[in-house]
């Protein structure tokens, strides 16, 4: 019988084992946080020591542009926040060819800058590599708003995309033109600009237009404030009394869609674009599996991906019965959502069948590393609302043990580890994303709590990466959610090794190499402190990251940890939590329980994310009546092993409170 320290039993039982039977209990805390109206102000509340006397020129630029074109200043600020969070992005285009704080689009310029995105992926061919040809930059409704803004302002398109102040003037001019085109007065009241705001989104469907306008007015009510990526301080004071005039949007004559067949919240614009489910020659089928979740088995995870393709091509790929699949795609330009696979069914998206069987996959239009491929606020907000809704509906806790990046999903066996995908990568802003879901990452313990939660100041934290444009070349400085991990305190010390990523385990600064990285929201067991450096247990090593007191990159946390049982020199870890052989019924092949190439040595501690009994969903035929769910008695703990999660058998470890 496995020995568990007496002191750990009540805590472990209440927080983990009981959660197997009562998943909704884990939801209560995040859900309460969603109702806090100041969630949009998270960046404003960041440590002020890191602001370095921010300048107010951008605030003045909004004020001047609003006055010049007769647009309410708050409307201009709110629209810009939805487009870019007021950032300039170093004059680089978004994935939808938008530039600057107002996201003025110039597709031809963006295509000249970015070119085709067909460079060889460092970890092997991308999933779309079998479809040759250059990718086109996506943009709204085929028009470039920078050219329109140039005609309205007399400012060159080149300056409009490069100069943030000019860019804001261009956005104000476009809003004013939309207001006039709708036959509406140049009113000082924000509500009277609902139609112009909706038209600014470029949406061609009524649902998308209403959603964008609704998000802008939601922001007007809550307010926001932050320091931009180039050090400018911007503030939008809250106006809780403001409500949009949606009848202005209704009179725009846009196409009505509807989310009648989708699993989406009512206030999101979703459409049903089904992925095919059909038999293929030779006895195969594609491109997903039918199931009956959660009635038959629970949904435990939501996996966040980026597409590495434009929205249009992504839709063509998911329509291919010989290809892979995912549940949702979110468009960058306006946050529009397409659902392809019903949540009760199993999509083929994570590269790990165990995770697929228990997960919902969401693709976001974007490119992990290409210069300027930043994600719009509209996309972040749509995704956050969708994930919040799905988490509540299916009892999924809002934490990084359950909301995974594709780059957090483990390989199933040693041979699959190196080829696992690495999206959404270090430029996905996990802190902002979780704040939008009402579950910001906070300190949950004191100095002796025993765990740390990674939490970078995204805009200010700009570690070195290479390989965004050319192999080995430094990437442009950019905000990042990840910290770098070294073998000893000091920026010049070697990076920790990841024996699964490449031969010899050597880690690099490559933007696609997460072998020596930890990312915002992930929790690790504390392994030491020395000056401005903090150590964690990571892939069987003590790993150090820079965590200075005046600009912290992590906060203290409490929870549960596992450590090898006494007498064990090390314990194996697994990429899937499969049942014991005795659990399989006749006719279902026994799946081997194969350890990964990693292990947890004696004396090391790893943060626990969840507990689960072994499970395998057998689905190898088009006929769903032959599908079988196998449940075992073996108990596993999911741990934060490295950048990816992994599983350990409960019989191999002791589970303890994390406090030290």
State the predicted function of each range:
Residues 1-28:
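Secretory targeting and sorting signals
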Residues 14, 54-55, 232-351, 541, ...:
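N-terminal catalytic cores of peptidoglycan-degrading enzymes
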Residues 50-52, 61-69, 153-165, 183-187, ...:
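Second-shell loop/turn segments in exported
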Residues 55-222:
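Catalytic glycan-binding domains that act on GlcNAc-containing polysaccharides
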Residues 75-78, 101-103, 300-306, 325-330, ...:
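Structural recognition of the beta-strand scaffold that forms the well-ordered cores
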Residues 212-274, 372-479:
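Basic/polar, cationic surfaces and motifs that engage anionic cell-wall
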Residues 514-548, 599-656:
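SH3/SH3-like beta-barrel superfamily modules
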Residues 548-591:
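Intrinsically disordered, low-complexity linker and terminal regions at domain boundaries
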